[in-house]
Swiss-Prot record:
InterPro entries: PCRF (IPR005139), Pep_chain_release_fac_I (IPR000352), Pep_chain_release_fac_I_sf (IPR045853), Prokaryotic/Mito_RF (IPR050057), RF-1 (IPR004373)
Protein name, per record: Peptide chain release factor 1
Pfam families, per the entry: PCRF, RF-1
Post-translational changes noted in the entry: Methylated by PrmC. Methylation increases the termination efficiency of RF1.
Superkingdom of the organism of origin: Bacteria
Family listed: Belongs to the prokaryotic/mitochondrial release factor family.
Positions where N5-methylglutamine occurs in the chain: Q238
GO CC, any one term: cytoplasm
Gene3D superfamilies reported in the protein's UniProt record: 3.30.160.20, 3.30.70.1660, 6.10.140.1950
Location (main, coarse): cytoplasm
SMART domains according to UniProt: PCRF
Source species: Mycoplasmopsis synoviae (strain 53)
UniProt function note: Peptide chain release factor 1 directs the termination of translation in response to the peptide chain termination codons UAG and UAA.
Amino acid sequence: MEKSIINSLLNIKEKYQDLKSQLNLPEIIADIKKYTKLSKEINSISEIVETFDEFLNLEENIKSSKELLDIETDAEVIMLAKEEISQAQSKQLELEEKLKVLLLPKDKNDNKDVIVEIRGAAGGDEANIFAGDLYRMYTKWCQQNNMKLSTLDLSPAVSGGFTLVTFSIQGEKAYSKLKFESGVHRVQRIPVTETKGRVHTSTATVTVMPEIDDDIEIEIKKEDLRIDVFRSSGNGGQSVNTTDSAVRITHFPTGIVVSCQEGKSQIQNKDIAMRILKSKLYDLELQKKQSEESGYRKLAGSGARSEKIRTYNYPQDRVTDHRIGYSTSLNYVMEGRLNPIIEELLLEEQKEKIAQAGI
């Protein structure tokens, strides 16, 4: 392995050990935000350190076996030592390739939690119903993958489903796993209201935004905001429908409008709405940067939220992700089993990064 890569790995290992020691400090243990942030940072490099340790152990084994060859005269022992060296060197090559991939530039948002927004788009009532189906799909995925989903805002549609649903997902590498869900999701099926058995095509849009943390400063001027309160129709508790607890915030420079009525008070709803607004503003900046990065094209496409990424074909029990040409069972996916698609998308992202790095 190149000396420059070895040096980088040694630096990462030193950083890892330093972070681990900080995790036991009383002031860190007492501060849940600092403890969580530090834990995420440790987790982000733990696989690199573990793989490098395995590589170094093999290096020691190879060295010991070679020293044995210098003094050993027994033919059988020599043969076994040579086999061990060969196997260890082969494994080392595998680990070397793995380490090169692990050292590829990381998306700085990959470890962040996310805010997800689903809207019924083209197709009227059927689009809203499909938006509800997608919401349930992600809910099931969270339950299966130790993720916490919290509903932030709901706008139920008269015919069922939602015109808009906004929710947060918290868990390990939530953004890394879900960032490629953004885009237009198309459904092909016979609506329950269809009397002639014709297949209709409808769409819902999904937007996945990293939830910003204390490390990111988003400047929002008071004069750029209009804050309206209105009577909630959500699940906020006893105050629902009796007080103006729901909050809507309009950001004049961008035209972004966010609302929240799922909290138990106006103050809580305002805080949640500001969280959503900050994530939306941060996401706008990300989209601008991604549109300038040619290597991001295949998975993120043009970067536009209007790009069709996936089709859910009910008559044929098939879901197809158009960016990677991957198809699987629709029933399987709608039950929340998204991981095979997610893994294929992450593999494609890895291939793009390798091509960019010239490895």
